[in-house]
Amino acid sequence: MYATQALLPTLTTELAVSPSTAALTVSAATGALALCVVPASILSEKYGRGRVLVISALGATTLGLALPLAQTAGQLIALRAAQGALIAGTPAVAMTWLSEELDPRDLPGAMGLYIAGNSIGGLSGRLIPAGLLEVTSWRWAMFGSALVAFTLAALAAWALP
């Protein structure tokens, strides 16, 4: 979700855009997520929480693998908006699903783990591409970050009930 934040100075140079245009790679994803959380929640009522969660996580991370192929800033921003829309199903479903499936006594600890995991994901989503950028291009940094995210999403999809 935040991989491009670590790459903003490089994106500005490599894509020959202003810093504010490069920043749209972050804003487009977070804005689309915000707009799509409620619709994703409604979809989870109709099609099932697990299905929406898996489609959301695998869809967003699969799209992340394609991000390095963007040739222009406009393409990258559009793909990031689509990625944000796809990932909206994850927060829309996760907390509700936990509250439905767990004993109320176990819920606070589970919610704490969810929030901690979300924070770790946000941090690693910045650190992984930043570290990779030290030894490779922004495209490979994005791909490496997306590959880690896809692997974890696939593992989660496999482990979910």
Task: Label each PLM-derived region with a short phrase.
Residues 1-19, 37:
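Extracytoplasmic
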Residues 2, 30-38, 122-123:
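Residue-level signature of mid-helix packing/kink "hotspots" within the transmembrane helices
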Residues 10, 41-42, 131:
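Membrane-interface helix termini in secondary transporters
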Residues 18-22, 26:
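Juxtamembrane helix-start elements in MFS-like secondary transporters
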Residues 35-71:
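Conserved MFS/SLC helix-loop-helix module at the cytosolic interface between two early adjacent transmembrane helices
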Residues 63, 74-83:
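Paired small-residue
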Residues 75, 104-105, 112-160:
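Helix-loop-helix hairpin linking two adjacent transmembrane segments in secondary transporters
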Residues 79-118:
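Cytoplasmic helix-loop-helix junction between adjacent transmembrane helices
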